[in-house]
Amino acid sequence: RLTITPDRIQAQDKSLKEISKIEWKHHFREEDDIDMDNIYTAVSGFDGRSSACNILIRNLLIALGYNCATSRAGDVYTRMDAVYSNEYSKGAVEIEFGKDTLEASRGILDDIATLQTHYGLNKKDNTALVVCLSFPNKRQGYFQVVKDIKNVLDQSIQTLSLGALLILTWNDAKVNFADNQFYADFDNLSIRAALEKHLKRKINITEGCLGILEPEK
């Protein structure tokens, strides 16, 4: 611990003035396969019974400019993993870092119904998200359920991965989920084009890498 002195305060002020001169390019880091692999390896060690995954996604949504809160244990009316909102969009969030993405697609429907019944959020105003560690493959049935929800209920469920949220955060992206730009279903399994359009550049992640932007090959 350093003692506060006039000289040290002066030195701090000088440093802050120099920092303020640094050009801010709204870009923290460049994504690549190696960094993502390291991050995914670390996350795979999370205890599945802990709330660490939910808190991580909550913090990333906050970094993107949204208010976000995870559910409280014992609250029977908020069994959803999280809810988010800002002036443009709001909705339920299902978070699935395991293999049970099919359950997440069904769970998000319960979340939408709960928010309408108990909290008055009309389903048409609920821009629901499913955030997974990796995009599920076609055989798991998740994307077919998402397509059915869209066709039958006219409800678009957007799908994002941990990696996609990290890329958006690293680029200080301004995301309006109400645009439904990250909608993917059985006929279009990728959000790569949507992410590249949003950032106006190519994404430096190999196709299929860790299921970040599309299912693994």
Model-derived features with residue positions:
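Interdomain/boundary linker segments immediately adjacent to catalytic/signaling cores
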Residues: R1-S51, E216-K217
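Catalytic core segments in nucleotide and nucleic-acid processing enzymes
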Residues: N38-L213
